[in-house]
UniProtKB/Swiss-Prot annotation:
Pathway(s) it belongs to: Amino-acid biosynthesis; L-lysine biosynthesis via DAP pathway; LL-2,6-diaminopimelate from (S)-tetrahydrodipicolinate (succinylase route): step 1/3
Subunit structure: Homotrimer.
NCBIfam families: dapD, PRK11830.1
Residue sites binding substrate per the record: 104, 141
This protein's name: 2,3,4,5-tetrahydropyridine-2,6-dicarboxylate N-succinyltransferase
Keyword Ribonucleoprotein belongs to the record: no
EC number(s) stated in the UniProt entry for this protein: 2.3.1.117
Chief subcellular location: cytoplasm
Pfam families the record matches: Hexapep_2, THDPS_N_2
Length: 274
């Protein structure tokens, strides 16, 4: 694996000179190997080790290299056709394979090859980009998008129209991460490598990037780039330094533990007590 990593790193440094027609066969084979392993969940762009997230940057580089290596081609899509560099994940699936992997895919959901979809996952008409990892028991609801290399935990609900940012456009240092047992409300956007920690509930229409202030109203603490575990978050504002206007912020209105979250419905958690 170390030898593969070194070859990917070297190819990435020379990426400006790589085209579909000029790429060396060995480099193409290495990138295909990585994409296939990501597709099967044998490797992932980010993984949690001893409570900390670690990004495997070389895997992300392989994903980026794939766009320089693979040429556009026609992709059959039932009633229509597409023309793109990345094939669709389920292009060769039959009923037996769908049943074996225990996933449900509602048309016209689009999932690119190189993304992993865990068992008992439901994909409504949604989009999952390559390099993404969607763990077991997760619901990706209608028109939700999971960006390139994003990491989605177990038993997560991404509501309708949710956007989980990727790392390709614009190029980001680390993937956006939604940990286990989180609920992301409709039309919310979590981007730029933000980590939403386990058991958090994000209300409808909350936008969080690295520069977004995440204000805990109980403690007065302001977080950036991280929603603490068990947070219930709504959109709001905080006063500017001059006091003349307010600026957007995400507000942590309460904290809940796993026991409370299991007993109380999501709608009840989102009711703000002044």
């Amino acid at each position: 694996m170390e030898a593969l990593r070194q070859r990917i790193e070297a190819a990435f440094e020379a990426r400006a000179n790589i085209t579909p027609s000029s790429v060396e066969p060995g480099v193409r084979a290495d990138v295909e190997t990585v994409i296939n392993m990501l597709d099967k969940g044998e490797m992932r762009v980010a993984e949690k080790i001893d409570g900390q997230w670690h990004v495997n940057q070389w895997l992300k580089k392989a994903v980026l290299l794939s766009f320089r290596i693979f040429d556009n081609g026609v992709i059959e899509g039932g009633e229509t056709k597409y023309f793109d560099k990345v094939p669709m994940k389920f292009a060769d699936y039959d009923e037996a394979r769908f049943r074996a992997e225990a996933i449900r895919v509602v048309p016209p959901a689009a999932v690119r090859k190189g993304s992993f979809i865990g068992k008992n996952t439901v994909l409504m008409p949604s989009y999952v980009n390559l390099g993404a990892y969607v763990d077991e028991g997760t619901m990706v609801d209608t028109w939700a998008t999971v960006g390139s290399c994003a990491q989605i935990g177990k038993n997560v609900h991404l509501s309708g129209g949710v956007g989980i940012g990727g790392v390709l456009e614009p190029l980001q240092a680390g993937p956006t991460i939604i940990e286990d047992n989180c609920f992301i409300g409709a039309r919310s956007e979590i981007v730029e490598g933000v980590v939403v920690e386990e058991g958090s509930v994000i209300s409808m229409g909350v936008y969080i990037g690295q520069s977004t202030r995440i204000y805990d109203r109980e403690t007065g603490e302001i977080h950036y780039g991280r929603v603490p575990a068990g947070s219930v978050v709504v959109s709001g504002t905080l006063p500017s330094s001059c006091g003349k206007y307010n600026l957007y912020a995400a507000i942590i209105v309460k904290k809940v533990d796993e026991k409370t979250r299991g007993k109380v419905g999501i709608n009840e958690l989102l009711r703000i007590v002044d």
